[in-house]
Regions:
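Short terminal hydrophobic/aromatic SLiMs and anchors at protein ends
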Residues: 21, 25, 32-34, 47
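N-terminal glycine-rich phosphate-binding loop and ensuing alpha1 helix
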Residues: 55, 61-110
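Conserved alpha/beta core of the MobA/IspD/sugar-nucleotide pyrophosphorylase nucleotidyltransferase superfamily
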Residues: 228-305
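Low-complexity, intrinsically disordered or signal/transmembrane-proximal segments
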Residues: 11, 29-31, 42
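Residue-level detector of structural "landmarks"
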Residues: 3-11
Length: 307
């Protein structure tokens, strides 16, 4: 077993492509896609669970694939997935965090851009070419799922470079519950983000099932009693294969179109989405200011790790 980049943990020898990878054909092109391997519970992962809020039970054995949708034609920040942060392209930091978790048999970047694909290949990051017509990241994940077999697929945002390996254990722990078909993460919402429509809020049932996601401030503190339990949604999703296929086959739903939140398609169609507590917040990079903040954080991490 060889260690993945940036990880002291043993990784599958096929997590990164090598010259003898046979590859799979996606989008009409041969790509270096690792074959899923069997994994179970790893004791060192148990130590990374956030604040004891989740227990990563042994989930039998699952094939788990991580997919990082990465569009180059971003509208708010041009070419953002390839923007350099602390010496690496943004998408590489995301891939390294996911790989370092040790929970996924393979982590693949899914893109419709040959330029993104070329950068990934140069850095030994598995890549799949997907259709330019994919309307959402989940559709891009489904396209990969049709070629890369797994039991669970993790949809990882390619524009969150401050993500760490510790975000994945609480998410995957939810799948120890057989009723969980789809899962995501949330974190305590900082006071300055409560009224920010770009910080999506989520409210859940007592069992962790999402009741609603909104750009509005939910719940509404009618009596102004000083409610502090607002939760911010983090855009990492995991699906069992059947749930992913079901979700991606559905047309956009009315509330999804109003709020511009694709996860509402699940709720409106009666597909339960369970929410785990993340160990912290991340920076979704949409502006030059976000990019600078991410640069500072990643350079601080590098200095700390090398110190």
């Amino acid at each position: 077993m060889t260690a993945g980049p940036g990880s002291g943990r043993a990784q599958s020898p096929r997590t990164t492509p090598s010259s003898d990878d046979t590859g799979d054909r996606i989008g009409g092109q041969t790509q270096c896609l690792p074959s899923p391997l069997r994994v179970g519970c790893q004791p060192d992962v148990l130590d990374e669970l956030a604040a004891g809020s989740c227990k990563l039970a042994c989930m039998s054995t699952f094939h788990i694939a991580g997919v990082i949708p990465a569009r180059l034609s971003s509208t708010r920040l041009s070419r953002k997935v390839l923007r350099m942060i602390a010496g690496r392209p943004m998408v590489e930091w995301v891939w390294r965090a996911a790989t370092a978790s040790g929970l996924m048999d393979s982590v693949v970047v899914a893109t419709d851009s040959e330029e993104v694909a070329a950068v990934c290949r140069e850095r030994n990051i598995p890549v799949a070419i997907t259709s330019a017509e994919c309307p959402s990241g989940s559709d891009r994940v489904r396209e990969v799922a049709r070629q890369l077999d797994a039991d669970i697929y993790v949809n990882i945002q390619g524009d969150e470079p401050t993500l760490t390996a510790g975000f994945f254990p609480p998410l995957m722990a939810l799948f120890a519950r057989p009723e969980v078909e789809a899962a995501t993460l949330a974190v305590h919402c900082a006071p300055e983000e409560i009224d920010n429509p770009n910080a999506v809020k989520v409210v859940t049932a007592l069992d962790g099932r999402a009741l609603y996601f909104s750009r509005a401030t939910i719940p509404f503190d009618r009596d102004r009693a000083g409610f502090t339990g607002y939760r911010k949604h983090l855009g990492i999703y995991a699906y069992r294969k059947a749930a992913l296929e079901h979700f991606a086959a559905l047309p956009p739903s009315p509330l999804e179109l109003v709020e511009r939140l694709e996860q509402l398609r699940l709720l409106e169609n009666g597909i339960a989405l369970y929410v785990a507590e993340a160990p912290g917040d991340t920076i979704g990079v949409d502006t030059e200011a976000d990019l600078l903040r991410a640069e500072v954080i990643m350079r601080e991490r590098l200095a700390r790790d090398s110190g």
